[in-house]
C-alpha cells in the first residue's frame, strides 16, 4: 500500500505540471482589447492632403495703360473696344446729320442748348462724364494687346504706363494700322470728340461742325471732302474687324 501511494504522488505532480493553467474571463477580454487596438493601429489609413494649385498664386496680373486694373470698375480692353466702335458709329452719324440738317447732336434730339453747363440735364452730364472716363481708360483697361503670329515670333505690347500704351497703341512701330489696338485708339478719339462736342453745344448752342465754322445744312454731294472722308473713316473703322487679340488676367483670348 505504501509503495502504491508513493508511486501515485509523482504521477499527480506530472499531471499538474503538464496541465496549462486557465485564465479568467476578464484577462481574456483585456487581451482581446489589446489585440484589437494593435490591429486598428496598423490598418488605419490616413487621407492624402489635397494638392494645392500654386498656379493661381503665381499668376501675373495683366495691366496696361495709365490707371491699370485696380483703377476702374472692371472693364477690359475688349469692352472698351466695343464701346469705342459704338462711339465711332455715333460720331460719324452725328457729323453726317449735322452736315445735312444743320443741327447738332442735342438739337437733333430736341434738347435745350445754349445754357450754362450746370443747368444741363443730369443724365446728359452723366453720359458726358462716362464718355470722358472711358476715353482715358479710367473705367478699367485690363488686358494687353497681342498681335497675330508672324512667322515664329509674335509682336506683344508689354504692360506699361506710357502715353501711347494708355491710348491702346504699341510703344514702338507704326502709329496707325488696322489692328484691335489701333481700333481702340480711334474709338477713344471718337469718345473724346463726342464728349467735347456735347459740352460745346450745351454752352454755345452750336453743333460740332458749326463750332468749327464748317458749312452745314447742305446736300450730301456738297459736303466738304475732308469732312466726308472723316465720316467714312470713322464708319469704316467701326465695322472693320482689326487683327490681333486682347489677353486678360484669366488667359482668355478676347
UniProtKB/Swiss-Prot annotation:
Induction: Strongly induced by blue light. Triggered by red light in etiolated seedlings; this induction is reversed by far-red light. It is found in: Plastid, Chloroplast thylakoid membrane. The lineage of its organism: Eukaryota, Viridiplantae, Streptophyta, Embryophyta, Tracheophyta. Disruption phenotype: No visible non-photochemical quenching (NPQ) phenotype. Plants missing both PSBS1 and PSBS2 exhibit a decreased light-inducible portion of thermal dissipation (TD), including energy quenching (qE)-associated TD (qE-TD). Plants missing both PSBS1 and PSBS2 have a higher quantum yield of electron transport upon the transition from high light to low light, but a lower quantum yield of electron transport II upon the transition from low light to high light. It comes from the Eukaryota. SUPFAM superfamilies: Chlorophyll a-b binding protein. Keywords: Chloroplast, Membrane, Photosynthesis, Photosystem II, Plastid, Repeat, Thylakoid, Transit peptide, Transmembrane, Transmembrane helix. It is a multi-pass membrane protein. Belongs to the ELIP/psbS family. PANTHER family: UPF0041 BRAIN PROTEIN 44-RELATED. InterPro entries: Chloroa_b-bind. Residues 1-38 form a transit peptide. Sequence repeats lie at residues 42-148, 149-253. GO terms for cellular component: chloroplast thylakoid membrane; photosystem II. Involved in high light-mediated energy-dependent nonphotochemical quenching (NPQ, qE) and thermal dissipation (TD) thus regulating energy conversion in photosystem II and protecting from photoinhibition. Also seems to regulate quantum yield of electron transport in fluctuating light conditions. It holds the Pfam family Chloroa_b-bind. The chain crosses the membrane at residues 86-106, 120-140, 184-204, 219-239. Signal peptide: none annotated. GO terms for biological process: photosynthesis; response to blue light; response to red light. This is Photosystem II 22 kDa protein 2, chloroplastic.
